[in-house]
Each structure stands twice: as structure tokens, then as C-alpha cells.
A protein has these predicted regions:
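Nucleotidyltransferase catalytic core that binds NTPs
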Residues: 1-161
């Protein structure tokens, strides 16, 4: 069974992330969504909340598993018996960083491939950072995130007001 890892902070998960995840299930028997704590980014949601939001959005697909990971991605991927890391590319601006990461991962673990997927056009501009900013300012994000994320953002941002 070929397995891939899709890592990220998912703070919060967006429909762009989900597009990449669901399309990756057509390429791999299992996709492990690996949620990184990423405390240096000062996340809005803690890692347990982010895992719960990803699970809620993906629970109907038995080929998707959600878990937390810390440390080197290549170590985690090898522990999971993954053959590939899936990364989403929204724009050229993503490519340079992702390409450098793919090369470093290949240096650290030559057997681990990196597969780049682009989201559908309607999600090509969507990022977690933009979603949080639009939500903070009262904008409608309902078509850009799962319903559970929209509710969670409203609750979380309502708490901080």
C-alpha cells in the first residue's frame, strides 16, 4: 500500500488544503495529514483543535488519517512507511520555498519523493493567514473553509474580542 504524508500547520484547514488532500487520495492508497504544532507561527488554534477540525472535514474518507507530528518530516514519513510527501503549490511564490524543502528532504532521505499538487483555480489564492484576516474583519469565508472551521473561527475570534 502506497502511503503519502501531507504536512502542514492547518491553522485552520481551508478548502484549498482539502482539495489537495482529496486529490492525493486518487494517487495514494492512504494520505496521512500530519499536523505540525508550529508554535513559532503563534497559531490561533492549538494543535488538538486543528487536528479535530481536519478530522471533522475528512472523516468520511477512510483513506485519510490525521495525526500530529514533531521533528523532521523525513523521519516522520519514514516511520509512517510513506513513499511521498504531498505539497500544495498555489503560486510561483510558493515554489522556491517548497523546492528547497523538497531538495533538503531528498538529501536527508533519497527514497522519499515530493509530489506537488496545485489546488483548483478557485482556491489558488486561499491561505490560512488570509482566511483568519478576512474572518477577523467580519468577511464571509463560508465558501473557502469547511462549515466546522467557519464556526470555530467565529467562536475563537468572538472570544478574543
Amino acid at each position: 500500500m502506497q502511503r503519502a504524508v501531507y504536512p502542514g500547520s492547518f491553522d485552520p484547514i481551508t478548502n484549498g488544503h482539502l482539495d489537495v488532500i482529496f486529490r492525493a487520495t486518487h494517487l495514494f492508497a492512504e494520505v496521512v495529514v500530519a499536523v505540525a504544532p508550529n508554535e513559532q507561527k503563534k497559531p490561533l488554534f492549538d494543535v488538538e483543535e486543528r487536528i479535530a477540525l481536519v478530522e471533522e472535514a475528512t472523516h468520511e474518507n477512510e483513506r485519510i488519517r490525521v495525526t500530529q507530528f514533531d521533528g523532521l518530516l523525513v523521519d516522520f514519513a519514514m516511520k509512517e512507511n510513506s513513499v511521498a510527501v504531498v505539497r500544495g503549490l498555489r503560486a510561483i511564490s510558493d515554489f522556491e520555498f517548497e523546492f528547497q524543502m523538497a531538495l533538503m528532504n531528498r538529501k536527508l532521505e533519497p527514497s522519499l519523493e515530493t509530489v506537488f499538487l496545485t489546488p483548483r483555480e478557485e482556491f489558488s489564492y486561499v491561505s490560512s493567514r488570509l482566511i483568519k484576516e478576512v474572518a477577523r474583519l467580519g468577511g464571509d469565508i463560508s465558501e473557502l473553509v469547511p462549515a466546522g472551521v467557519s464556526r470555530a473561527l467565529n467562536e475563537k475570534l468572538g472570544e478574543s474580542s
